[in-house]
Structures are given as structure tokens and as C-alpha cells.
Amino acid sequence: MMPQYERKQIIIHISCVIICVVVTLTLFHVFWNDNYIAVDVNYDVPYNFSVSPDFGFNTTNITWSLKPYYKYDINDLMNTANSVFKIWSRTGLNFTYIKNVDEAMVRIYFYRQDHNDSFPFDGKGKILGHAFYPNRHRINRGLAGEVHIDADEQFYFNDKLENMSEYDDSINLHAILLHEVGHAIGLLHSANKSSIMYPYYGGSKLGVDDFNGIQQIYFANKYKHNKIFTYNKYHKLETTSSSTPSYYGNRDRYPINKKRSLSSVFNITTTTVKPSYDKNNTFTPQKICFNITSSYKTHNTKLTAIRKYCTGHIDTISVIRGELYIFVDEYHWRFRSNGLLYSGYPLKTTHSWSVPIIGRFKVTSAFETLTGDIVIGVNYTTFYYFDRMSMQLYRMQKLPLHLLPRCRSTKKTIVFSIDSHLYALCDRIIREIDFNSLRMKRMKTKRSMLGFPLVSNLITVLDHDGIYLFRNDNTYAEVIRSRVDSSSSYFKNNTDKWTIC
């Protein structure tokens, strides 16, 4: 018979093994658990597009409708819309018109100016329309599947683009609807120039990427079990290399200073921009003239924020839905893609996002999740998640204290997004973290993953048409070929490019 002390030792050893296994599995779950949604991709064909299994309807039988607008002939509108849906039906989807626009899955409306969806139109020119992606997991439909067209525009009704010059400043409605309906049924932008979803005006024929994108969303999606639709060549299509332009990457982004651009709102809605604006416009904010009147003087916090802004002092800078946002104290500036400031700004951050904070605060980070929800980081460690459709606050998340254990102060931690990856940085310690849980994805993150050297005193990193580093001394530097630009004495004052007053 085994002595009692030996039995105790065996029990202790077994207990230690069990504890080690439990701890190991727990750490594995904490640090390697990804909340990303896997996207099924057909690797047998070249692809240049981004798809999400979230964006799409739960059926291939899709109803559509259009609300007439007095300015346009109803027959012209219906003929144009019918032509658009007939083209998209070549992908294997079945589109059916119904009279009641409120009951349709894809709904086309004409609106002017502010129309209560947080994306006001700007009158004739520039912004032509936008569309909201469908979401198969949403219980409430909301704006999903809606296409909004700026009713102040002058459209002509012709599905051929060869003779656009004959119509002066008129806009081809067929081209706009064809692209926007693509978004309304779930497609993001494509980097393939032959695609309808390429972010510039194109023809009226679907490209290979358009077919492949619909296949991945509706026929080869792991959430569905339909028979996979076989692509048939309805017309001759050019195939291109699967590589994408260097400026495009895997993001739904594109250069904003090119002619005939379709300006997109990333992962939520897409905005179509009239192609005839000044081609010399850049993403750099244009000069702003502030008239400090007595009304400003009664609001000391706003006056202080404006003075800080004009001297180059910012808390963070980010691109949200394709537009530049600069945050200073409790206020933020919002710029159009051509660098012009939206009317009425700066506004309090709580005006745009219902951050439940009483008293003074500052935004220290702002980014979008992979599914398009907007996250506002306040005072370094608190993050508020806003729904991509309703813009309602649905979650508050604290940055885990153990994330950067050697960080001397949480107020030195910055969170930023680069090329669809989220990072936390403190005292030159870098960790890739999960968009949703803010937990660590890797025990060790290589600095080379960032594509730029770690610089001290950073307050944020901006990734849009290049990578820019911002420091707490009101200066910035552009990263060129994975190096900080040394030809301009490294860092320049923010007032040279970003906060021009």
C-alpha cells in the first residue's frame, strides 16, 4: 500500500499540472483570441476587392424601390433604375421592384442638404450621393440598403458615358446609381480599374471583381449554404494582376486629389463626389480665418481650443469615414476631402459623439474597427464604441492595465491604426491589439511591422495617403520609405500643413 505522504505528493503534482494547463489556456485565450470575422476568398481567381460577410442581405432575392422626386421625370428615373438593377442581376442576384419604398430592401431616395442621417449634402456640386451597406446580422434595418442622391444636382439620364462632355455640368445618374447600388448590396471598393466598384467613374459593364465580390458575399459565404454561383462571361472582360496599387492596400481608401473621384465613407456609406472640382485640391486642410467675436469670448473653452489649434497644438488627428478630424481639448475640426472645413466647426466632441463624460476631457485617439464602428478614446485609457449605422454608443471599454506592463504612465499610451491593424505604444514598447477587446494579439510585436522608427514623445500616428508622426511639441514628420524624412529637418510645425489659420 502506498504511504500517505507519497499520495499527498502525487496529488500535489497533479494539482500543479492542472493549474499550469488552466493558466496556459487562459493566457492563450486572452492574448490570441481574435474577434475578427474571417472572410472566405476564392483563391482560384485573382481579386482586388475587400468583402465582409457582414455586409449583405440574407437572401439572393432582393426587392428594390425608388421614391419619385418632383424635379425629375418619373419615367426617366424608373428607366435608369431598371437598367442599373438589370446589370447587377447578371451576378446571379434576383432583383424585384415593389411599389412601397418603405418595404423594399434597397431603397433609393432624393434628398437636399441635411436629411437626418448625419451626412448632409452640400448643394450643387462635390457630394452627389451616398449609400449604406446592408448587414445580415442586424435585427433593426435602420438605414441599411438605402441610397441617397443629392436632389440639388442636375442629372442627365443616359447609360452611356462616352458623350459626357455634351452635358456640361450635368451628372450621369446611371453611373452614380450603378456604383451606389453596388454599395447598397454589400460591395466595398475595388482596385481593379475595370470594376464598377473602382472609386472613379467607369463604364456600364460589370468587371470580374464585381462578379467575384457578389459571389463571396452571397454564394460562397460561410454563413450561407447556397449552391455557389458559377461566373459566366456575359461580355468580354479584361483580367488584371491580383496586385493592387501601393496607395490602395487592403483598405477601402483611395487618393482624394484625383479627377473624377468617388469619395467614400469607410465601411459605412459611400459618398459620390462630382468629378469636376479643382484637381489641385489636396487632403491638407485649407486656411481658416477665425473671427474672435464677443460670442467667442463668452465661451472660454472654445476660444482656448481655437488658440491652441492655430498654434499647432492638437491632442490627436485621425481619418474617420474618409474625412480628416482634428481634436483639441473638448472640440474637434472636421474637414472635407478637398481640405475645406465643414460649416459650423469646431464643435464640441459630445455634439457628434455622445461621450458620457461630465467635465473637461480630451480625445486621445479615434479609429474605426474592421466592421466600421467608430471608437473614441478619451483620456488615454477609456474607449467608447459607436454603432456604424445608428451612431449610438453601445459599449465602453477600458484599456487593460497589464497591456504594457513596463509603461511608466498610462498617460503616455497612444492607440492608433495602420493598414487595418491596431497598435498600442508607450515608452517605445509596441503591441498589436484587438480592435474590439483591446487585448493583446501578440506577446511581442516587432517594431518593423510598423514600417517606421519609434520616436519619443509621440501623441499619435496618422495613416492616410502616407504615414505621419505627431509629437507633443506641436510638430509632425512624414515617413518616407520607412524612414522619417530627414530632408526637412525631420519634424515641422503642425501649422505648416495641418492647422493653418
Swiss-Prot record:
One of its GO terms (molecular function) is zinc ion binding. Keywords: Glycoprotein, Hydrolase, Metal-binding, Metalloprotease, Protease, Signal, Zinc. Glycans are attached at residues 48, 58, 61, 94, 116, 163, 192, 267, 280, 291, 379, 493. Its cofactor is Zn(2+). Its EC number is 3.4.24.-. Binds 1 zinc ion per subunit. GO terms for biological process: collagen catabolic process; extracellular matrix organization; proteolysis. Residues 1-26 form the signal peptide. The keyword Repeat does not apply. Zn(2+) binds at residues 179, 183, 189. One of its GO terms (cellular component) is extracellular space. Belongs to the peptidase M10A family. This is Putative matrix metalloproteinase.
